[in-house]
Amino acid sequence: MATSASSHLNKGIKQVYMSLPQGEKVQAMYIWIDGTGEGLRCKTRTLDSEPKCIEELPEWNFDGSSTFQSEGSNSDMYLVPAAMFRDPFRKDPNKLVFCEVFKYNRKPAETNLRHTCKRIMDMVSNQHPWFGMEQEYTLMGTDGHPFGWPSNGFPGPQGPYYCGVGADKAYGRDIVEAHYRACLYAGIKIGGTNAEVMPAQWEFQIGPCEGIDMGDHLWVARFILHRVCEDFGVIATFDPKPIPGNWNGAGCHTNFSTKAMREENGLKYIEEAIEKLSKRHQYHIRAYDPKGGLDNTRRLTGFHETSNINDFSAGVANRGASIRIPRTGGQEKKGYFEDRRPSANCDPFAVTEALIRTCLLNETGDEPFQYKN
């Protein structure tokens, strides 16, 4: 399995320089989503002092013609800070800054789905929507070969790898542990992690997060994972079906509740939400991967713990359904439900916005409603 050339550089030499004092100056790494809707970009600027809140961070710009976001003749795009975290790579007082992207005319870029998501979340803030997203991913070599897999064959069939322990069952735990600790340091609401069903496949959970925080925290957790993998010389892919055949795909199961669902007899509101979702299946399928459902076509086959992409289904503790109600929720008559349809490479802003539109704003039909400002 191939690893990157950069990972073979002497990290001890780098540490000599990273341990130098930086005075009062602060490095702020600005992060944004590029024109693919999946890729992340970043660049760093120096600040004169440590910012205490997002309002203290300046706007910036970048060349959108190099990120699939504009033409060269009018390429400047604006970076508007939206969320700030501690930097686990450069450490305090340095920052990671997640940004929204705006075009030259100050309109949101096509892949800036945070902008409308924030408006929708503000409309239902009194219902306190909580989300938790289960991000699955697969570790690969730079040659595209799954991490730890035999070079000329396949590992043993699925079965022993889920939550597995041992060198023959857990592939790449060092990366998982490094990512987990880096997220905790950064202030990401990471809930846990586990090895998944396919060897070299892992999962981390983000949440519970209220409203717009869900997308901010998951995107920055993804960024941190990519940076950790960069240090180890490997790749983390969010492809929903990285290996064809009898291997599990990768999803981003999304858990959702409102204040009413979490309180006594909240199961009534959970069931009402599921009924609304059942009538808007195709709208959600289009929102749940960046290619309008094409990526999920490879994953949602009705096999490997998935539902069929063409059918809506729901059930208690049923991992072959579109929507799963956890057994505890069925017993306690309150809690949350899990939408198992989002793909691993989904945009969490698109997913959470779609859930709010259908379940709380009572939208119907195949298109989102256009609200007036």
Curated annotation (Swiss-Prot):
Stretches that traverse the bilayer: none
Modified residues (N-acetylalanine): 2
Binding site for ATP: 134, 203-208, 255-257, 319, 324
Record carries keyword Metal-binding: yes
KW Metal-binding (keyword) present: yes
Localization of this protein: Cytoplasm, Cytosol; Microsome; Mitochondrion; Cell membrane
Protein name per its UniProtKB record: Glutamine synthetase
Organism per entry: Sus scrofa
Gene responsible for this protein: GLUL
